[in-house]
């Protein structure tokens, strides 16, 4: 079931008719499922995983439940990126029925898939037909870009205009994440074993942020309760500093522990009483690096086109 506001989805799905037939394409890092993609009329490439030496694709033969069962059971889980062949095959298929493709992968700072797609789009057979947007976003903010692109295509904007808008708008988003365990940051090399051990002994909860490109450290807290409040406070500060006024959306996002996430959702709603707070799960590729029990709050400026 789609979790975005009915007003936004109505705009995305029904308004206007494009002069060009433009396809919108993304990957499952956006949190968009195959069912949601079909409902929206877009294309979503599943991200590949290797679990104990076996290959899987997110939302194809790898469910959230199966993924967390393996991850929490100690399986060796690795993320990967779609092959050039898979991307090229999908582009070729789409271009048989469309004039252009807007391709919105996850941030180039978090995966090589964006750079690979950008190099492919520069080849003669795709130049001027495939527009790869490095939106420097992931999860709900990447999904917001997809919905903006779809709405613009349905309003009649050209592929170049959509690409330019998304590129210029990429920094109008903010995400803060806190993790329940440091184990997965250590496994992924984002935290040294010594630092992870010390932080664990001190019961420190790190807060991470995505402000364009990479996942970076923002701060630390001694309790999850304080970390939750710090994230909300900083999102509010970012909204104020960037002058968004009331022209923004807020989201509460989580990995695995829905009960804790629903509790945090109420806290986010209290902090933003005039907003319809979006509630969503983190994509598996993000969860793989930060682990189950993670909570995040995000905000992004509403589309203006």
For each feature predicted by the language model, list its residue ranges:
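Mixed-charge interfacial surface used for oligomerization/domain docking
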Residues: 17, 23, 29-43, 48-50, ...
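Short, Lys/Arg-enriched N-terminal segments with co-localized hydrophobic residues
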Residues: 2-19
């Amino acid at each position: 079931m789609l979790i975005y506001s009915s007003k936004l989805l109505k705009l995305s799905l029904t308004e206007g008719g494009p002069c060009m037939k433009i396809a919108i394409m993304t990957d499952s890092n956006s949190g968009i499922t195959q069912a949601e993609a079909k409902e929206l009329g877009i294309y979503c490439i599943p991200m590949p995983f290797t679990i104990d030496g076996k290959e899987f694709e997110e939302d194809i033969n790898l469910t959230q439940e199966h993924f967390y069962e393996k991850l929490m059971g100690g399986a060796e889980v690795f993320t990967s990126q779609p092959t050039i062949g898979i991307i090229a095959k999908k582009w070729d298929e789409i271009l048989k029925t469309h004039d252009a493709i807007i391709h919105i992968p996850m941030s180039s700072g978090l995966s090589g898939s964006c750079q690979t797609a950008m190099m492919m789009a520069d080849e003669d057979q795709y130049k001027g037909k495939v527009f790869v947007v490095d939106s420097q976003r992931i999860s709900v903010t990447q999904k917001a870009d997809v919905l903006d692109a779809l709405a613009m295509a349905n309003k009649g904007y050209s592929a170049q205009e959509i690409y330019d808008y998304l590129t210029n708008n990429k920094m109008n988003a903010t995400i803060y994440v806190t993790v329940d365990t440091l184990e997965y940051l250590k496994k992924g090399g984002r935290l040294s074993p010594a630092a992870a051990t010390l932080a664990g002994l001190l019961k420190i909860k790190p807060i991470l942020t995505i402000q364009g490109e990479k996942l970076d450290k923002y701060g630390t807290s001694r309790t999850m309760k304080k970390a939750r409040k710090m994230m909300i406070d900083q999102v509010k500060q970012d909204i104020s500093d960037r002058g968004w006024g009331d022209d923004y959306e807020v989201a509460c996002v989580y990995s695995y522990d829905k009960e804790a996430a629903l509790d945090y959702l109420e806290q986010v709603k209290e902090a933003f009483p005039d907003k319809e707070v979006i509630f969503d799960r983190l994509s598996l590729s993000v969860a793989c690096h930060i682990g189950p029990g993670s909570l995040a709050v995000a905000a992004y400026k509403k589309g203006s086109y």
